[in-house]
Amino acid sequence: MKVKICGITDMETAKRACEYGADALGFVFAESKRKITPGLAKEIIQELPANVLKIGVFVNESVEVIQKITENCGLTHVQLHGGEDNHQIRRLNIPSIKSLGVTSESDMKNAQGYETDYILFDSPKEKFHGGNGKTFSWELLAHMPKELREKAILAGGLNTLNIEEAIRTVRPYMVDVSSGVETEGKKDVEKIKQFIIKAKECSK
């Protein structure tokens, strides 16, 4: 099971997450309490192992801005949380992830229409896109077609207490956590370590 730690804002957390076995780190460039500047993201990314995915999170940003930040920071993928369509995805020409809030099984069917490398299934958006600590009914994704499952990333309120059930129900390619590894709104490296251990153990 691949694990993504999202909402990285400092070097120490990024390095520790990689040491503990994170496969991907997310850097939020959209409005969020976890927003990071491109300059700081670049500094962190330059110090990370080559095999770790560096994912930039954007919401309804212009193609030009996304391309510029991707190139300057050394991102490997972009995660799109707004109303982006396949026309914009093709124009970007960057490995991409489309995030979709899940409220019914039809959201899973809609996901198959996106021309992205991965689909991130999240809880429906609130004030900010993603990172709100809320789960959704994983049963809605239980009967996902194999070709979609192979590129599915599960997010939304995951933590060490529910990750086993989430993986067993959805069987995604990757799981994504942000608020579930925080204490008082800050990333907690011990929680990151335990989450990664649990996710990788329960998927063996």
UniProtKB/Swiss-Prot annotation:
Matching entries from Gene3D superfamilies are given as:
Aldolase class I
Which SUPFAM superfamilies does this chain map to?
Answer: Ribulose-phoshate binding barrel
Name a biological process GO annotation.
L-tryptophan biosynthetic process
The cross-references to Pfam families, in alphabetical order and at most eight, read:
PRAI
Any single GO molecular-function term of the entry would be: phosphoribosylanthranilate isomerase activity
Catalytic activity field: N-(5-phospho-beta-D-ribosyl)anthranilate = 1-(2-carboxyphenylamino)-1-deoxy-D-ribulose 5-phosphate
What's in the keyword line of the UniProt record? Answer: Amino-acid biosynthesis, Aromatic amino acid biosynthesis, Isomerase, Tryptophan biosynthesis
Provide the top EC class: isomerase
* Record pathway: Amino-acid biosynthesis; L-tryptophan biosynthesis; L-tryptophan from chorismate: step 3/5
- The catalytic activity of this protein is classed by the Enzyme Commission as 5.3.1.24
Q: Which PANTHER family match?
A: N-(5'-PHOSPHORIBOSYL)ANTHRANILATE ISOMERASE (PTHR42894:SF1)
Family the entry assigns: Belongs to the TrpF family.
Q: Which NCBIfam families match?
A: PRK01222.1-3
HAMAP family named in the record = PRAI
Record's protein name: N-(5'-phosphoribosyl)anthranilate isomerase
Organism in which the protein naturally occurs: Bacillus cereus (strain ZK / E33L)
